[in-house]
């Protein structure tokens, strides 16, 4: 029995550019075979739609991979119900891992503007995929040098040594090691890997600034998650994911055991107090 949203997802996938579509079909078929329900709710986007998203803060740039048929947006599902807070659930992680193995880049790995629903197929760079010519014999994603990519050598090394291999942490490490404007290129990753292996000392990254008193009301500057506890772990990430510009009423403050401030929202869930991510209004 096919999942509730399979036909809708397939129809959207079929709008994609040739090689992106081939990879997305493999991903969708794999998820069906493994009992992982998703809704691929958007693929192709018009310039007018993208402009509206930029104006609303939902998107950061007009240079969207949706415009060239190389991106899709998804949400985890169970029957008719979609779950915007399940991107880092067990099934969500498996789906994202499979997508990455097929050559997709996940917006949830990005620093600053985190975009959990977003998967983009870089192929040979922005706008390099085709329409109506069929997938190439080797349709793996081959990002250009300026594309935000992961080097398996670097990530594997960090994971093996129990280091945080997220893009955000790699960017912090790169800055502390003197690697400017880190974007995850192969050259930058190779340099960072060499410095990590050499164990060269580095200066700590700049300290984060937090609200320490109740700001009463804040607006999110980036996509933010809500947690049922001051401990921001995947297990506690049950309050949903909210886009930039979302306004929250703050009823109180909390702190982790390590002393990191948290904002307690009116709903009872906790939100980051980091001034890089939320702003008092």
Curated annotation (Swiss-Prot):
InterPro entries: DUF5776, Hedgehog_sig/DD-Pept_Zn-bd_sf, Peptidase_M15C. GO terms for molecular function: peptidase activity. Keywords: Cell wall biogenesis/degradation, Hydrolase, Secreted. CDD domains: L-Ala-D-Glu_peptidase_like. It is found in: Secreted. One of its GO terms (biological process) is cell wall organization. One of its GO terms (cellular component) is extracellular region. Its EC number is 3.4.24.-. It comes from the Viruses. Cell wall lytic enzyme. Hydrolyzes the link between L-alanine and D-glutamate residues in certain bacterial cell-wall glycopeptides. Belongs to the peptidase M15C family. This is L-alanyl-D-glutamate peptidase. The gene is ply.
């Amino acid at each position: 029995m096919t999942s509730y949203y399979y036909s809708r997802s397939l129809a959207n996938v079929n709008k994609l550019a040739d090689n992106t579509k081939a990879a997305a079909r493999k991903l969708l078929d794999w998820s069906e075979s493994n009992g992982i329900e998703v809704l691929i709710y958007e693929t192709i986007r018009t310039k007018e739609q993208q402009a509206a998203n930029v104006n609303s803060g939902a998107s950061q740039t007009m240079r969207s991979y949706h415009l060239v048929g190389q991106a899709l947006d998804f949400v985890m599902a169970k029957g008719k119900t979609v779950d915007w807070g399940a991107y880092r659930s067990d099934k969500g992680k498996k789906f994202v891992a499979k997508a990455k193995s097929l050559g997709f880049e996940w917006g949830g790995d990005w620093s600053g503007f985190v975009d959990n629903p977003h998967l983009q197929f870089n192929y040979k760079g922005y706008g390099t995929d085709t329409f109506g010519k069929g997938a190439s014999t080797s349709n793996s994603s081959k990002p250009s040098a300026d594309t935000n990519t992961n080097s398996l050598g670097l990530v594997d090394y960090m994971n093996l040594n129990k280091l945080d291999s997220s893009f955000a942490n790699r960017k912090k490490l790169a800055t502390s090691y003197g690697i400017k404007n880190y974007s995850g290129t192969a050259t930058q990753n190779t340099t960072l890997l060499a410095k990590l292996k050499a164990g060269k000392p580095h200066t700590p990254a700049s300290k984060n600034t937090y609200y320490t008193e109740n700001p009463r009301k804040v607006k999110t500057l980036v996509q933010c998650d809500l947690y049922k506890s001051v401990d921001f772990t995947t297990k506690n990430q049950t309050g949903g994911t909210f886009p930039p510009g979302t306004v929250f009423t703050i009823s109180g403050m909390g702190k982790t055991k390590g002393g990191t401030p948290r904002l307690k929202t009116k709903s009872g869930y906790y939100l980051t107090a980091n001034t890089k991510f939320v702003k008092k209004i």
